[in-house]
Amino acid sequence: MGSEMCIRDRFIHVNHSIADAVAFAIKTPVGTVVMTGDFKIDTTAEDGMIDLARLGALGKEGVLALLCDSTNVERQGYTPSERTVAGSFERQFSGCNKRIIVTTFASNAFRLQSLITVAKKFGRKVAVTGRSMENILKVSTELGYLKIPAGTLVDINQIKQIPNNKLVIVSTGSQGENMSALYRLSLIHI
């Protein structure tokens, strides 16, 4: 039949909205295959910069195939750093004296941290809704990715007791999914 083939994996740190994202290089007898997964180049990322030196070294060694995925790769220019999002939140929060509702991917712990930090700065409580958002919040806090000041988080069931100008709701449903937390929020007119 065929002969055995030894494959050795090498993991390379990349930036993405998900913490600890990696690309990997598979060394085979016929050449190296690099799979990036979705990534962006962010020089100020919370979890460290993409390992361009390691990717460059692989390129110098020779790569048989590069399997690359990067959202908006066809657009010219650069993808802004996740840190720029906090500035956008600050601008929006500073001009708002009503309840703020924000949707985001539940898996983006860095964005959730930005929201929590800015909400605290503006004296607002944060309630999260959506099962995946609640799960990510719990796990990311346990793993140390999220630093949540005491007294900042409130249970979604307690939001009617908080003045609108002191509340931020972070919800799943940023892509308009039926039955997402955002969709359900819209049905009860909170």
Feature roles, as predicted:
Residues 3-4, 8-162, 176-187:
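His/Asp/Glu-rich metal-coordinating catalytic cores
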Residues 164-166:
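Active-site lining segments that contact anionic ligands and/or coordinate catalytic metals
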